[in-house]
């Protein structure tokens, strides 16, 4: 995955995957990090993420069934300090409070995946200002079946 390549993991990182769905993106990175925390609001998707982790023999992942905004704010208040945060929000982009919570968590890297270039640009700009994470790399991937024509990925790093 392009997102894993752009994240440039060194090994042992704490990765938070917001809007994780069935865990596909985070689980592809789990073998490169120390711990994965996935957050998704859809209960069936969270159960699928847990099943996918088990099926793949991944033991360093946990998944929370929660709204991304509420979870991000709570994780920031708890003092969680992830090395990398991955977001793959809906087309409307991230809620501003999600980006503020990410800034409070002070990650070294933010990997933003989107099918909407306008919200990707808007949110990466806000992340750059709030968290001091200027965009470093970007790329795009091929089409997904019966989905948008391409996925874009932007990495912001301190």
What are these regions (language model features)?
Residues 1-158:
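Rossmann-like S-adenosyl-L-methionine
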